[in-house]
């Protein structure tokens, strides 16, 4: 079991990365689609959290597969036990600390919104099955004019998302691109 302080430091690192490095990468033309967002988050989180990751046997993996749930997480932060005598690294993973689902789109079609909403349902399923009790980060860059940057409604944020989910949002409001963090997890708000 990982110490709460470590979880809070990871949470702080993810939120700061979104508000600083991801914003800079976006405005400097380093982010084109979801995969470049994933690469950027991976790079910046490994850099920012390097010491914490090493001290706590934590690893960051893209496209991490949860076989029991039959889902791929875009990014997962996991803890490994290096003393386990197994051939496969996957068998040394003892805890999941954080899961990130990412979306990056410039379209405003119903299909785009449905893909985003499907990731919300994926996170909801992770939480409601109780098989994966960790922190969840839903990161969306939506290059379309928005009324609001939030994707979760009050019913979600007051129920299943409370204590677990943080939205990392970006979208256009009145013609300007905005980035924000909406934490429902009670940490580093």
Q: Which sequence ranges carry the predicted segments?
A:
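Charged, often low-complexity linker/regulatory segments
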Residues: 1-44
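Well-ordered, non-membrane alpha-helical segments in soluble/globular domains
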Residues: 10-15, 113-122, 157-162
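Short, well-structured hydrophobic secondary-structure segments
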Residues: 32, 36-58, 66-71
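Active-site metal-binding core of divalent-cation-utilizing nuclease and nuclease-like domains
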Residues: 54-92
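Conserved catalytic cores of phosphodiester-cleaving nucleases, focusing on short active-site segments
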Residues: 75-77, 94-106, 123
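Active-site-adjacent loop/helix micro-motif of nuclease/hydrolase catalytic cores
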Residues: 84-87, 107-121
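Short acidic, S/G/P-rich loop/turn micro-motifs used as interaction or catalytic elements
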Residues: 105-110, 145-148
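Domain-level recognition of nuclease-like catalytic cores that cleave nucleotide substrates
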Residues: 128-189
């Amino acid at each position: 079991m990982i110490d709460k302080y470590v979880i809070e430091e990871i949470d702080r690192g993810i939120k700061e990365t979104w508000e600083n490095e991801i914003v800079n990468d976006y405005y400097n033309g380093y982010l084109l689609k979801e995969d470049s967002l994933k690469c950027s988050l991976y790079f910046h989180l490994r850099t920012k959290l390097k010491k914490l990751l090493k001290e706590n046997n934590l690893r960051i993996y893209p496209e991490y597969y949860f076989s029991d749930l039959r889902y791929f997480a875009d990014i997962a932060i996991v803890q490994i036990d290096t003393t386990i005598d197994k051939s496969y690294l996957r068998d040394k993973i003892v805890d999941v600390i954080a899961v990130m689902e990412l979306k990056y789109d410039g379209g405003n079609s119903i299909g785009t919104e449905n893909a985003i909403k499907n990731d919300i349902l994926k996170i909801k399923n992770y939480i409601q099955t109780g098989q994966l009790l960790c922190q969840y980060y839903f990161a969306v860059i939506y290059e379309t004019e928005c009324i609001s940057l939030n994707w979760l409604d009050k019913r979600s944020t007051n129920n299943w998302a409370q204590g677990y989910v943080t939205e990392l949002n970006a979208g256009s409001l009145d013609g300007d691109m905005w980035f924000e963090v909406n934490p429902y997890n009670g940490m580093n708000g």
